[in-house]
Regions:
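C-terminal ends and interior cores of transmembrane alpha-helices
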Residues: 75-90, 263-277
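Intracellular juxtamembrane helix-capping segments at the cytosolic ends
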Residues: 107-120, 295-310
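Helix-loop boundary and gating motifs at the non-cytosolic
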Residues: 1-51, 196-230
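A late C-terminal transmembrane helix in Major Facilitator Superfamily
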Residues: 311-340
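C-terminal transmembrane helical hairpin of 12-TM major facilitator-type secondary transporters
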Residues: 255-299
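Helix-to-loop junctions at the C-terminal end of transmembrane segments
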Residues: 52-67, 241-254
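Juxtamembrane intracellular "pre-TM" segments in multi-pass secondary transporters
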Residues: 1, 175-204, 377-394
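Symmetry-related core transmembrane helices of the 12-TM Major Facilitator Superfamily/SLC fold
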Residues: 155-175, 345-364
Length: 394
């Protein structure tokens, strides 16, 4: 646990901060710069900064990872506070602040997840990833509920304090644990993308990210005032099933868990496409979406890219796996102006169709949990059952 504690603090602090900072920053942009063109431009600058930061960070951070992660967390706290400078009269200043904000997210996220992967063994990575994401999910939920009574300036200051707190804890824990040695191999992006196993997992993940964020504004339109409550319940379900998904990923393999997640998503959107006017379909959607997100968070987001990296440095794998999800967050901004022209049932039907189609590459994808580890677990379970049977009749 001593080895793993710094990774938990780092990932928990970073992902909670990222989720709430992005949401709060988006609210500030929408309130301050309501003009459609400028609004889309500023959102785009922020997400562009994330992409630029992630690509740059994957090259730079492995050289002195722990030190750079500390600098990154300090940068995050400063930029969080500086976001209050955004206003409708100085768009150039807004652009500078937002590209800095995007880079303050992107620079260290791949290294944070790579750090997590390097502190876990492949046979336990899913379980640890699930437990970590459960903590993240409940952390976001608790923090978000606490922030509801705060105005935007106070929210930004609270997030800055949260970031500094994580920095101090990570600094102390890394000094207690000692330096973590990095894998020596540094693969190129081209070599990674030419790998068949990476492509077969990356394509469905891209498809999921596009569908998820494209459908998000449509779901808000359908659920109306119930959206906030549904989001809270879904976060709680995700928090529970992240741990379940992680444990299952270590027991039966990552591939089966991921395929199950896509099947669940396909079913929930099919239900909405047929019965979105019935409240019961909302309950089904909330339950299924929470389960699917739990499975994906622990396995697809936290575990899979570390598995695929094997003995290589893992930052670039997490960049390729993380960017589709991070950049797809820009899609709701583009979709909102066209909500009135979108037929809800058609949108949900298309989403369901492509989510089922996304399973096809996964069928041909290799299992990333070594077969030997699965056999060892099965043999261990068989021996334990045999002992219990023997004790029962002796």
């Amino acid at each position: 646990m001593k080895e793993f504690a710094p990774a938990v603090v780092l990932v928990l602090n970073s992902l909670v901060w990222f989720a709430l900072f992005t949401q709060t920053l988006g609210t500030l942009i929408d309130r301050t710069v309501p003009m459609p063109t400028e609004n889309v431009l500023l959102h785009g600058i922020y997400y562009g900064g994330i992409a630029l930061g992630a690509i740059l960070g994957a090259f730079v951070f492995p050289r002195r990872r722990e030190n750079y992660l500390l600098y990154w967390m300090l940068m995050g706290s400063i930029v969080t506070t500086a976001s209050l400078l955004i206003n409708s009269e100085q768009l150039y200043l807004d652009a500078i602040v937002l590209i800095a904000a995007g880079m303050s997210v992107g620079l260290g996220l791949p290294s944070s997840l790579a750090y997590f992967a390097d502190t876990t063994a492949v046979e336990n990575r899913g379980t640890y990833g699930g437990i970590t994401w459960s903590t993240v999910g409940f952390g976001i939920l608790a923090f978000a509920l606490a922030l509801t009574s705060m105005d935007l300036p106070t929210t930004f200051l609270a997030l800055a304090v949260w970031r500094v707190t994580g920095l101090l804890l990570f600094f102390i824990l890394t000094r207690l644990r000692g330096k973590l040695e990095l894998p020596p191999s540094k693969p190129r992006y081209g070599a990674i993308l030419r790998r068949r196993d990476v492509t077969l997992y990356l394509l469905p993940w891209i498809m999921f990210s596009l569908i998820n964020f494209t459908e998000a504004p449509i779901l808000v339109k359908v659920f109306g005032e119930s959206q906030e409550l549904i989001g809270v319940v879904e976060f709680a379900i995700t928090g529970i099933f992240a741990t379940v998904g992680g444990i299952m990923g270590d027991l039966v393999g990552r591939k089966r868990v991921v395929i199950a997640g896509f099947m669940i998503l396909g079913i929930e959107y099919a239900v909405l496409s047929l019965f979105s006017s019935f409240t019961a379909s909302w309950y089904i959607y909330t339950l299924f979406d929470g389960i699917a997100w739990g499975l994906f968070a622990s396995v697809f987001f936290m575990t899979l890219w570390g598995d695929l990296a094997e003995t290589n440095q893992k930052e670039k794998f997490y960049v390729l796996g993380g960017l589709p999800y991070l950049l797809a967050g820009f899609l709701p901004v583009l979709v909102k102006p066209f909500l009135g022209k979108i037929e809800t049932a058609t949108a949900f039907s298309i989403a369901s169709f492509f989510l089922f189609i996304a399973v096809l590459p996964l069928i041909y994808a290799p299992e990333t949990l070594p077969e030997k580890k699965i056999k060892e677990r099965e043999l261990r379970d068989y021996v334990e059952k045999a002992k219990k049977t023997k004790d029962k009749y002796v």
